[in-house]
A protein has these predicted regions:
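The alpha-helix within a helix-turn-helix
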Residues: 66
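Short amphipathic alpha-helical interaction segments
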Residues: 70-85
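A short, conserved structural fragment
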Residues: 81-97
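Short helix->loop/beta-hairpin flanking segments within DNA-binding domains
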Residues: 33-61
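Short, amphipathic alpha-helical interaction segments positioned at domain boundaries
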Residues: 104-119
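Long, low-complexity, charged/polar intrinsically disordered regions in eukaryotic proteins
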Residues: 1-29
Length: 119
């Protein structure tokens, strides 16, 4: 008989919601993200509002991420390059950077379902 494991995570706010989401789906990605890459991307994902939707990776938001995560300019650039190389983010024709759609969770609540099969 199959055992169904259900667990809810409640009370995650801001970047913690997005970092946890990335941690849950990470083993299923073609190329896994490091813990720091998940932290950087999750922080960018947490920004809300019209300005964030237009250019989430603008200088303003990069500065915010550097402050929150205590990163240097070079450190953030290295993580962004790694995220780009892994296909987590991409540069659009107009120069803006966007997050790969398969990484974006639903707002406020995300459900997951998967199964593993032996053999």
């Amino acid at each position: 008989m199959a055992v169904i494991i259900q667990k809810g995570l409640v009370g995650l706010v801001g970047k913690d919601y997005y970092i946890r989401h990335l941690s849950i789906i990470n083993p299923f990605l073609p190329v896994e993200l490091t813990p720091k890459e998940r932290e950087v991307l999750g922080t960018f994902m947490s920004f809300k509002g019209e300005v964030a939707e237009k250019d989430r990776f603008s200088t303003y938001f990069r500065k915010e991420v550097k402050e929150v995560l205590k990163l240097s300019d070079g450190g953030l650039s290295n993580h962004l390059k790694a995220l780009k190389d892994k296909g987590a983010i991409k540069e659009e024709l107009n120069g803006t950077i966007t997050i790969a759609s398969f990484l974006l969770p639903a707002e406020r609540q995300q459900f997951y379902q998967f199964k593993i099969v032996e053999g």
